[in-house]
Amino acid sequence: MDEIKIQLSEKDIPKQWYNIAADLPNLQPPLGPGGKPISPDMLAPVFPMNIIEQEVSTQRWIDIPQEVLDILYQWRPAPLRRARRLEKFLNTPAKIYYKDESVSPAGSHKPNTAVPQAYYNKVFGIKKITTETGAGQWGSALAYACSQLGLECKVYMVRISFDQKPFRKLMMELWGANCIASPSDETQFGRKILKQMPDTPGSLGIAISEAV
């Protein structure tokens, strides 16, 4: 039987992140609402400076902090699986593989970035992180990351998903996060939306506005 799963050992986990910006010398800067390039100062009200520095960095390799690695070791390296049935369905001679990120505590690839983002917030002195989530995957990932790093976490979850996916909410709460249906009466913007559309299912844009 052909091998359908490739599983590396913990010693093979990467110790550095690769920054693709180093190999994209003509990469255009992100633009703000006015159509002009965003400066670090414009991001400072939302993100800590050490994360902003990475956002604009052109350094090719960035060392992964040991505290981050210690958390990632709980499920990484994730297995590489061969999609034999998909190959058969497509009638292709190609070998198709996919990275199985369902093995993470939150069940997706999102803890891979949630953990380092929470870590760098902690290093900067942040005690509480507020975020938004649509269907709940990102909220679950950040709730998990904050639980591992001793941070408070508040998540505004799009109301329709909040109602339809109670187990995602439960998962976030098990990790100590405060999960709130958005729009909510906790923010000025949320109250404005509820007044205009009391039966709104919410949207990711509304949740982002409440979190910010």
What are these regions (language model features)?
Residues 1-212:
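PLP-dependent amino-acid enzyme catalytic core
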